[in-house]
Amino acid sequence: MDIVVIRDDIYPIFNNEDKIVLLLGNHQEFISNFISKINIHALFYCKYSIIPDEIGTLNVSIIESSHKIRGRYINVEEFISLLYPIQLCSKYTYKNDIDHDTMFIHDIIFFNNTWVRILFIEFLGIIDKQYETCIINPYLVKDNYKIFKNILLASIINNIIFDKNSTLIELINKLYTRYHIDKYIMTCIVKYNDYNNIKLIYHCYNRNKFNAFIYAWFRSQITCDSIEENEKVERMFNNISKRI
């Protein structure tokens, strides 16, 4: 995955090539400006919301689209399967959704000498940095549903960077079937002074990896000399394991 750290509001230029862009933090002005520029072309779009439920299942809904058929929004894959009918295209009016417990995907295809498809995956970031450590195990805050949704989404973002088996990658592959997607063809954009989101891309919060490290470290503390000390090490390991 390419990681682009933004300084002085200088963003990469996306040429006429398909692209999947993960936007961490507030990049709404960039998205709005980009869409304004491509609105001069024939354009079809759909917008998805991703919201975790109380047990952590991701609910994905299409909430906007260029066109409906019999009251149902059609998506970009259907637009392509219909052979790009221009009459279904429309301009896209970007809305500044300020919502930390929802992830949005803007799936846009436009014609500029050739059909170009852009996916913007938009996540504002951690709502409260005091819950940062809960990214390792979001279920520690499951009693606070708003915080739980936000921290679970942060965990999913972290996994897409550090784990081959990513829920978000699986989801994108269902939305984008033109060819198989993996994280290595994605671009992640974050602002240089957005410290919480920078941690998401440079610090691994994977619970299984934490457990493996803790287990290995505590195993190295066990000796053949003292049963009592070994029991203390084991108790400490069990106490820490319960907290992550």
From Swiss-Prot:
<protein>
    <recommendedName>
        <fullName>27 kDa core protein</fullName>
    </recommendedName>
</protein>
<dbReference type="Pfam" id="PF04580">
    <property type="entry name" value="Pox_D3"/>
</dbReference>
<comment type="similarity">
    <text>Belongs to the chordopoxvirinae D3 family.</text>
</comment>
<dbReference type="InterPro" id="IPR007660">
    <property type="entry name" value="Poxvirus_D3"/>
</dbReference>
<keyword id="KW-0946">Virion</keyword>
<keyword id="KW-0426">Late protein</keyword>
<comment type="function">
    <text>Late protein which is part of a large complex required for early virion morphogenesis. This complex participates in the formation of virosomes and the incorporation of virosomal contents into nascent immature virions.</text>
</comment>
<dbReference type="GO" id="GO:0044423">
    <property type="term" value="C:virion component"/>
</dbReference>
